């Protein structure tokens, strides 16, 4: 089970951290401890949100995120606060255990998470040279342009076609697949425009 695996990983991490002198093993121990704590936290959260499917206020809040603008904004803000896209996706997966996360809510939140993931990159670029700042901006623009492109395309088509899966209930696996497909599709769409994005970045951060 997940709890057993987390416990084993935590024990190994503690051994590496406390009883092995080499710094490399200590770093691995820190990673393993962090991973096990994350897994336990996700499992605890999953169990806690399951009863909330019958809570009217909880359902109303999640329904609000079906609005694309609200969902995207929530994803951006949440990821900016957590400083981790992986943690944000994990929490969304945990919330899906309540059975109240639909595709209509998961999609805009996932789009927002992609943009919010640029926040720690932008923060880390403060104080770096111009190339460091340009790298951070490329990360931001890739996520931002991808979100804008797919928002316009998907919701424009949905306004005409009315996709039947919009109200489908999402599971943790489906959310992981959605996040992966969205990221891959964004990369494929933006590949032909890499040079244009580069030009925009150089206009923002000039050589002079």
Annotated model-derived regions:
Residues 1-4, 79-117, 125-131, 156-163, ...:
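Membrane-interfacial helix-loop connectors
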Residues 33-36, 76-82, 94, 107-117, ...:
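Transmembrane helix-bundle signature of multi-pass membrane transporters/permeases
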Residues 3-15, 72-74:
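Transmembrane alpha-helical segments of multi-pass small-molecule transport proteins
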């Amino acid at each position: 089970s997940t709890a057993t695996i987390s416990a084993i990983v935590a024990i190994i991490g503690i051994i590496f951290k406390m009883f092995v002198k080499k710094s490399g093993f200590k770093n691995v121990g820190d990673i393993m401890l962090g991973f096990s704590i994350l897994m336990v936290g996700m499992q605890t959260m999953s169990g806690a949100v399951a009863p909330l499917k019958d809570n009217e206020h909880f359902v109303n809040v999640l329904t609000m995120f079906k609005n694309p603008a609200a969902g995207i904004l929530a994803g951006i803000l949440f990821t900016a606060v957590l400083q981790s896209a992986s943690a944000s996706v994990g929490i969304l997966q945990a919330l899906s255990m309540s059975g109240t996360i639909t595709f209509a809510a998961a999609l805009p939140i996932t789009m927002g998470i992609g943009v919010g993931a640029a926040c720690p990159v932008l923060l880390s670029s403060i104080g770096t040279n111009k190339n460091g700042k340009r790298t951070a901006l490329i990360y931001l623009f890739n996520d931002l342009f991808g979100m804008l492109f797919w928002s316009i395309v998907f919701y424009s088509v949905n306004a005409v076609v009315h996709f039947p899966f919009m109200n489908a209930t999402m599971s943790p696996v489906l959310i992981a697949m959605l996040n992966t497909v969205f990221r891959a599709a964004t990369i494929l769409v933006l590949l032909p425009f890499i040079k244009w994005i580069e030009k925009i970045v150089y206009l923002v951060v000039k050589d002079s």
